[in-house]
């Protein structure tokens, strides 16, 4: 299933994987998965985390390696009810709930994920997604960015 991904997608997922893989050992544990999900405002139980890992843990060792992670992401991308997931992701970024993601909100979430971005990098991300040029990202722009192939 992962063979349907573009090289660019694989590179993006590699970056995401390394955000999860806090100790850099090439695998994601339930603890690491929990840390990242909580930093995104989710609050999964230990059992839910274990289920998520078991779903994709092909070799049964209780952790997710990069090929398993790719399979999971490819499945998620095929999953068509992603509208709700995108809306949820938008809410994570839109801290004050005003319907827009500002540079400050984007920086805050990225910092929580362990990504230290310069102001210039944050502004660049906003510019790329900001279709109407108002300096922030509304929901429609966010959807466009998230679903861009």
Curated annotation (Swiss-Prot):
Protein family per UniProt: Belongs to the calmodulin family.
Protein name per its UniProtKB record: Calmodulin
Pfam families in alphabetical order: EF-hand_7
Binding site for Ca(2+) 3: 94, 96, 98, 100, 105
Native species: Myxine glutinosa (Atlantic hagfish)
Misc remark: This protein has four functional calcium-binding sites.
InterPro entries referenced in this protein's UniProt entry, alphabetically: CALM/Myosin/TropC-like, EF-hand-dom_pair, EF_Hand_1_Ca_BS, EF_hand_dom
Cellular component, GO, one term: myosin II complex
Keyword Repeat: yes
A GO molecular-function annotation: calcium ion binding
Highest taxon in the source lineage: Eukaryota
The EF-hand domain, residue ranges: 8-43, 44-79, 81-116, 117-149
N-acetylalanine modified-residue sites: 2
Protein keywords: Acetylation, Calcium, Metal-binding, Methylation, Repeat
Binding residues for Ca(2+) 2: 59, 61, 63, 68
Residues engaged in binding Ca(2+) 4: 130, 132, 134, 136, 141
Signal peptide limits: none
Modified residues (N6,N6,N6-trimethyllysine): 116
Cited function: Calmodulin acts as part of a calcium signal transduction pathway by mediating the control of a large number of enzymes, ion channels, aquaporins and other proteins through calcium-binding. Calcium-binding is required for the activation of calmodulin. Among the enzymes to be stimulated by the calmodulin-calcium complex are a number of protein kinases, such as myosin light-chain kinases and calmodulin-dependent protein kinase type II (CaMK2), and phosphatases.
Binding site for Ca(2+) 1: 21, 23, 25, 27, 32
UniProt KW Iron-sulfur keyword: no
